[in-house]
Amino acid sequence: MKIIKISPRGYCYGVVDAMVIARNAALDKSLPRPIYILGMIVHNKHVTDAFEEDGIITLDGPSRLEILDQIDSGTVIFTAHGVSPEVKQRAKEKGLTTIDATCPDVTKTHDLIEAKKSEGYHVIYIGKKGHPEPEGAVGIAPDIVHLIEKADDLKTLEIPTDKILVTNQTTMSQWDVQHLMEDIKKKFPTAEFHKEICLATQVRQEAVAKQADVADLTIVVGDPKSNNSNRLAQVSQEIAGTKAYRVADVSEIQLEWLQGVEAVAVTAGASTPTPITKEVIAFLEQYDPTNPATWERKRNVPLQKILPRVKVKKQ
């Protein structure tokens, strides 16, 4: 069986930066304890489990404000997905020490919304409902930001001005965003468009579109909560025309997927640890459908191999 290692794949700079910030926080003895992450620092359970070993507590919930209500003291890390000004203000009022690990690409979108609000615009924001990134973006100016996920959401959308900005969640499918923007243009012809798909998301999606088309199957390594991982599977199926499955790690691979497969493409979401992806590739490289000894799918990557190394500062 031929293995096509799609490149680029895996970690983006925003994810690595967020994890380094959190690791440095764990090593900083001057920070008030306990240290919490407000939601998953990045959408990967292997990463949050590894941080738990570092003594950092991940709290998750339906909204950042509701999670914050669980915290009375200590240090709070804001995740790569960004948070609203209301969350930052509430943390300040509670006397919490805060560390901001927001991805710079997300901050760029927040700044754009702020600027357009001051100019009297309304904003149509294309994003996935229930995902923390749109929650933070809408929270920048909830009175003028309108979240839409699908074309159907446009049917009931009314905006009381011709000054309209259209932007989006950074990890959406670029093709979905483009189609929605075309629909928006028909309904709101005066709208201005700022496509904010981050470069890492864009090049990973384009790599799948161009490289997975010669495979019989694509395996995307990524957490079920990772929007960019789920979008990679979508791109494989809808753009490359190759059936795709998303797995959190090697243990989730089903042998029946591999029946009759001569070429399998492998990629990984931007929040997927490299050792987890390497383990999937190693399994596929040694897999022999006629030899049961090669069929075991067990995750063996130790948690201490998940997080990036950081230099310990001398006291």
Swiss-Prot record:
EC number(s) per entry: 1.17.7.4
InterPro entries hit by this protein: LytB/IspH
Identify the residues that bind dimethylallyl diphosphate.
43, 81, 131, 226, 228, 271
Alphabetized, the UniProt keywords read: 4Fe-4S, Iron, Iron-sulfur, Isoprene biosynthesis, Metal-binding, Oxidoreductase
Summarize where (2E)-4-hydroxy-3-methylbut-2-enyl diphosphate binds, as residue positions.
Answer: 43, 81, 131, 170, 226, 228, 271
Q: In which pathway does it act?
A: Isoprenoid biosynthesis; dimethylallyl diphosphate biosynthesis; dimethylallyl diphosphate from (2E)-4-hydroxy-3-methylbutenyl diphosphate: step 1/1; Isoprenoid biosynthesis; isopentenyl diphosphate biosynthesis via DXP pathway; isopentenyl diphosphate from 1-deoxy-D-xylulose 5-phosphate: step 6/6
Q: What GO MF terms are annotated?
A: 4 iron, 4 sulfur cluster binding; 4-hydroxy-3-methylbut-2-enyl diphosphate reductase activity; metal ion binding
Q: Where is the active site?
A: 133 (proton donor)
The record's annotation in Pfam families points to: LYTB
The family line of this record is: Belongs to the IspH family.
Could you tell me what this protein is called? Answer: 4-hydroxy-3-methylbut-2-enyl diphosphate reductase
This protein's encoding gene:
ispH
